[in-house]
């Protein structure tokens, strides 16, 4: 989750720190409570696939921890899975709704704009079910942000997993969209 605030624009440490943290942590809540937030941009995982393995370099730069890498069949895993990898609540059917509610609550509490990146799933083609539906996000916005208008921006490119070329499903139609609430 990316937080853009009038203060954080000039405070590199606060901005980079907020980008790498668990959005539900007490430290993040304290950090965001002390800022004047203009826009919240959320590009969370939509599926059970963990994104944390693809953010290894920013995590090392931020925390200066060198994780022990995971081995599978005698080789290091792709995407760098640290042994104690972070698991996003957005990747869990049980926790995803609560994580989205937290983001919408932040937008409501700060009376700021919210931009959510999303991709609808055509499950029968990809088998990659989303943790929450677009309908759920729109209902949540109606409940939490009743005075915000909605702009839905459709992109002409598909959501793509970071897979080897021979693992990519070519016939899917999972278009990326932005939901802009302001």
Where are these regions (language model features)?
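Short, well-structured alpha-helical interface segments that form or flank functional binding sites
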Residues: 18, 39, 95-102, 174
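Conserved Class I SAM-dependent methyltransferase catalytic core
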Residues: 84-149
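SAM-dependent nucleic-acid methyltransferase catalytic core
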Residues: 1-55, 70-77
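A short acidic (Asp/Glu
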Residues: 29-35, 50-58, 125-134, 162-164
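Mobile active-site "lid"/loop adjacent to the S-adenosyl-L-methionine
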Residues: 48-95
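Class I S-adenosyl-L-methionine
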Residues: 134, 138-182
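Generic recognition of flexible, low-complexity loop/linker segments
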Residues: 27-30, 102-105, 165-167
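Structural motif
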Residues: 41-43, 115, 180
């Amino acid at each position: 989750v990316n937080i853009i605030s009038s203060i954080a624009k000039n405070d590199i440490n606060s901005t980079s720190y907020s980008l790498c943290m668990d959005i539900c942590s007490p430290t993040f809540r304290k950090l965001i409570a002390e800022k004047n937030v203009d826009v919240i941009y959320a590009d969370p995982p939509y599926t059970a696939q963990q994104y944390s393995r693809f953010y290894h370099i920013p995590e090392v730069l931020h925390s200066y921890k060198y994780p022990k890498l995971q081995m599978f069949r005698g080789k290091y895993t792709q995407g760098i899975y640290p042994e104690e990898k972070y698991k996003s609540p957005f990747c869990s059917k049980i926790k995803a709704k609560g994580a989205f509610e937290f983001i919408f609550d932040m937008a409501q509490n700060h009376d700021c704009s919210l931009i959510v990146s999303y991709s609808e799933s055509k499950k029968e083609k990809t088998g990659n079910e989303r943790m929450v539906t677009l309908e759920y996000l729109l209902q949540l916005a109606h409940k939490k942000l009743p005075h915000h208008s909605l702009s839905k921006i459709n992109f002409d490119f598909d959501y793509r997993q970071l897979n080897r070329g021979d693992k990519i499903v070519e016939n899917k139609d999972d278009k990326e969209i932005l939901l802009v609430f302001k």
